[in-house]
Amino acid sequence: MAKLALIEREKKRARLVAKFAAKREALKAIIEDQSKSEEERYEARLELQQLPRNANPTRQRNRCAITGRPRGTFRKFGLARNKIREIAFRGEIPGLTKASW
C-alpha cells in the first residue's frame, strides 16, 4: 500500500487540474492563435507560466484505487495488475476470464 500522503498529493493534483483546466485551455488557444499580436501571445505565455505546476495534467500519475500503487495500473479498471488478478479470480469483474488457448 502506498503512503497516504502520496495518494492525497495525487488527489490534490487532480483538483488543481480541474480548477485551472478552462483558464489553461484559453491561454494555450491565445498562444497558438497566429492572428493575435506578438505582445498578446507573450502576455498569455507569461500568465500560463504563473499557473501552479501541479495544474498541468502531465504531472498526474494514475494510481490504483485500492492500494495507491503507481505502476502497473490498468486505466480501464483503475486498479493495479495484482488487484485485478485477485478480483477477477473471485469473479467480481463481469466478462473477465482467464485466458486459455
Swiss-Prot record:
Domain of life: Bacteria
GO MF: rRNA binding; structural constituent of ribosome
Coiled coil regions in record: none
InterPro entries: Ribosomal_uS14, Ribosomal_uS14_bac/plastid
Keyword terms, alphabetized: Ribonucleoprotein, Ribosomal protein, RNA-binding, rRNA-binding
GO BP of this protein: translation
Keyword Ribonucleoprotein found: yes
GO cellular component, one term: cytoplasm
Any matching Pfam family: Ribosomal_S14
UniProt entry tagged with the keyword Metal-binding: no
Subunit field text: Part of the 30S ribosomal subunit. Contacts proteins S3 and S10.
Family to which the UniProt record says this protein belongs: Belongs to the universal ribosomal protein uS14 family.
Protein task: Binds 16S rRNA, required for the assembly of 30S particles and may also be responsible for determining the conformation of the 16S rRNA at the A site.
Protein name in UniProt: Small ribosomal subunit protein uS14
Species lineage: Bacteria, Pseudomonadati, Pseudomonadota, Betaproteobacteria, Burkholderiales
